[in-house]
Amino acid sequence: MVFLIIVVAIVAWVVFAYNRLVSLRNQVDNSWRQIDVQLKRRHDLIPNLIEAVKGYMQFERDTLTQVVEARAKAVSAPDQASRMAAESQITTGLGKLMAVMENYPQLKADGNVLKLQEELTTTENQIAFARQAYNDVVLDLNTRIQIFPTNLIASNFGFKAAEYFKGAPEEQAVPKVDLSMTTPRA
């Protein structure tokens, strides 16, 4: 009788651990889909923004080209890792584009450009929140896969650690800020 209770308890624990891993894997997949929705929105906004600003920004072709090429890589990426890398390039390119746009007063006055810029900023914020939620769920899944004794269930049923969504190295760099009160002399 005691043996039967122990066997039932072990089987129940295995079922619980397996179901928890499946649930976490599904949460990771769902979190990625949430990021995907926002990335699709960003991909839809980029051509409109490029079209709106390219007439003004004759000397910034490299920046515009970088954004367009990164978008093309992201859309055609064969796997999630390649897509994450391409999306990081888009984020970097859009950051440069927004910074360069500050040098063009005509763009600041163009209502269509301002609306697109606002939509893109909102989308970037939503992507950041979705990435954070995704990475939180990945942390939970990866922790479960690595801790004993759940790691035994994970390895026997083929559960793999998920990859974090990492930002581009440029996003992680500490910005240089000059707070000196002196003005540069020519």
What is the predicted function of each stretch?
Residues 1-186:
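A helix-centric hydrophobic-segment signal that preferentially recognizes long
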